[in-house]
Every structure is written in C-alpha cells, then in structure tokens.
Amino acid sequence: MARAKQTARKSTGAEAPRKQLASKAARKSAPATGGIKKPHR
C-alpha cells in the first residue's frame, strides 16, 4: 500500500489510469484462469 501511495503521489495521472487498466485486465484474466468467478458471472 505504501508503495502504491508513493507511486500515485509521484505521478498522479499516469500511474493511476495504468493501475486501473491493469486491475481491469487482471480481473478479466482472473475469471478466465479460475480466480474471481463472481464478478464475471
């Protein structure tokens, strides 16, 4: 958490969207791999 906070503070606007995109991709990949099936279903 501390690391994410520092990164966000360092570049607010380039890291935030990137993190959100990664989160979205990870969430989409998770159900495909068998991680989070609730949101996908």
From Swiss-Prot:
Top-level taxon of the source organism: Eukaryota
Major subcellular location class: nucleus
Presence of keyword Repeat: no
SUPFAM superfamilies cross-referenced by the UniProt entry: Histone-fold
One Gene Ontology term, aspect cellular component: nucleosome
Residue numbers spanned by region Disordered: 1-41
Function: Core component of nucleosome. Nucleosomes wrap and compact DNA into chromatin, limiting DNA accessibility to the cellular machineries which require DNA as a template. Histones thereby play a central role in transcription regulation, DNA repair, DNA replication and chromosomal stability. DNA accessibility is regulated via a complex set of post-translational modifications of histones, also called histone code, and nucleosome remodeling.
Protein family: Belongs to the histone H3 family.
UniProt-recorded name of the protein: Histone H3.2
Annotated source species: Tetrahymena borealis
